[in-house]
Amino acid sequence: MNELTRADWLKWASVTVGVAGAAVPLSFLLWRTPPGVATPPASILPVLIPIAVVIPALSFGLGVAFILFGRNLIRADRPSVLSRASFVSIGWLLTNSWPHSNFHRVSEGWANLVVVDYFFHTTVIIGSCIVAVFFLTVIRERRGAAQINRSARDLASASTT
């Protein structure tokens, strides 16, 4: 399953947009703005709302689609621990910006802000490291397989001459 069909793209897009569409209003229901928290000036809201609410919701929706549809690929083989960890990491990297930005919006005081940032930033760094190791491992395995194929071709051509 290396290529996505039109139906696959439609499934992914539907889940992404559907979840994002639900996440935007849920942002304000689940994370109610506490009274007295500083609010941004009205002049920057047209820029702030897409960055702080819509884009994280779309990323969250894509993360949900990735988890829903990507898990079948993980189940297909006996995945390594690194493959599973990468799957979880990618899911987290895609979904975490929605709660992260909402916790920022409602955090009261520097202590709460520090806790939010330590938790989210640390887990993003860990997840990114896992994905980087996975990527390098896959590239090395492919390079090794390519070398084996070249060696086999060289042996085959040498034996025919």
Where are these regions (language model features)?
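Cytoplasmic membrane-interface segments at the C-terminal ends of transmembrane helices
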Residues: 3, 65-80, 131-150
